[in-house]
């Protein structure tokens, strides 16, 4: 799908048409913590985050979708952006533990993944 192909120059964070795209560290040449899903969610997954801390990420290979709904701007709470970021990274890492075996079964030995 065109919307999931990187539309940015290689020096910038990979983004499709409205989606952040997770790429391997060797391609990004920076830490994968820059990605809102964290280092443990699969490469080539795509996602988008919202101002209030909401997040939607999906792995097109295993068909796993992760949706996190939150409200970090509730008037009775202090600004907790860093806590929401840490939560997202932990959530995606934990869910990928269950996803890894399904993902490996889905990949075919002859599959070739290319990066633009």
Tell me what each language-model feature is.
Residues 1-2, 84:
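Short alpha-helical "patches" and their helix-cap loops
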Residues 3-4, 91:
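A generic structural signal for nonpolar/aromatic side chains embedded in well-ordered alpha-helices
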Residues 5-65, 97-109, 113-115:
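Active-site Gly/Thr loop motif
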Residues 19, 80-81:
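Domain-length accessory/inserted modules outside core catalytic folds
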Residues 72-75:
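A short acidic/small-residue loop/turn micro-motif
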Residues 81-105:
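Surface-exposed amphipathic alpha-helical segments
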